[in-house]
Amino acid sequence: MNQVAGQRNLAVRRDNRLGTVLDSAAKCFCERGYDAASMRDIARDAGMKAGSLYYHFPSKSELLVAVHEEGIRRVTTLVTSALTRPGSPRKQLEAAMVAHLEALLGGGDYAQVVIRELPEMNEEQRCRLIGLRDDYEKIFKKLIDALPLETDRMRRHLRLLLFGALNWTRTWYQAGDEAPSDIAKGFLELIKET
C-alpha cells in the first residue's frame, strides 16, 4: 500500500471512530451528566483506550461542544425537513414544534444533552454553544414573525414560552400518553392569534 492510500485509510478510520466517540459521549453525558461522566467512561463505552480519546478531543469540554454541535445539527435537520411542506404560518410553526418534540422525546441522547444547562467551560466554548443555540432559535423566530401578532414583544414572549414548554416536556412526558403532534397542537391551542 502506498503512503497516500495509507493516509486515506487512516483518515477514514479516524472519521469512523469519531462518530463512535460522539455517540458514546452523548450517551454518557445523558446518563451521568457532564460532571459525572469521565473521559475514561466515554472511552470504555466507545471500546477504546482512554488515551486514544484525547487523540480526537484535547478535553472533555471540547468533546461536549462537539456533541452539542452534532445534536443541534440533527435537530435542525429534522425541523428544516418538516418545513419543506407548504402551509400557513401557524401550520409551519406546528410542524417545527412537532419535529422538535420528536427529536427531544425520541430517546436520542444528543437532544437530551443539548437542552441541559451548560456546564462550566471557557468563554470561547460557551460562545460557540450559545451561537449554535441562537442559530437554531432563529428558525422559530422566523416562523413566529410570520404570525399575525400585535408586537415584537409578543413574538419574543411567545418564542420563549414555546421553547420553555417544548423543552420541559422531557421532564413530564410518559411514552404512550400523547404523540408529539398532539402535544404541539395542544400548546398552540392555548395561544390565540390576534
Give residue ranges: language-model regions.
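N-terminal intrinsically disordered/low-complexity leader segments
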Residues: 1-16, 27, 86
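Generic hydrophobic, amphipathic alpha-helix propensity
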Residues: 17-25, 42, 67-75, 79, ...
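Helix-turn-helix
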Residues: 20, 24, 28-62, 66
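Short coil/turn segments at alpha/beta junctions that flank glycine-rich nucleotide-binding fingerprints
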Residues: 31-35, 86, 107
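Hydrophobic alpha-helical connector segments
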Residues: 66, 80-106, 158
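Amphipathic alpha-helical packing segments from all-alpha helical-bundle domains
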Residues: 70-80, 123-149, 155-160, 182-185, ...
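Amphipathic alpha-helical segments used for helix-helix packing
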Residues: 92, 104-124, 171
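Amphipathic C-terminal alpha-helical segment
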Residues: 103-106, 142, 159-179, 189-194
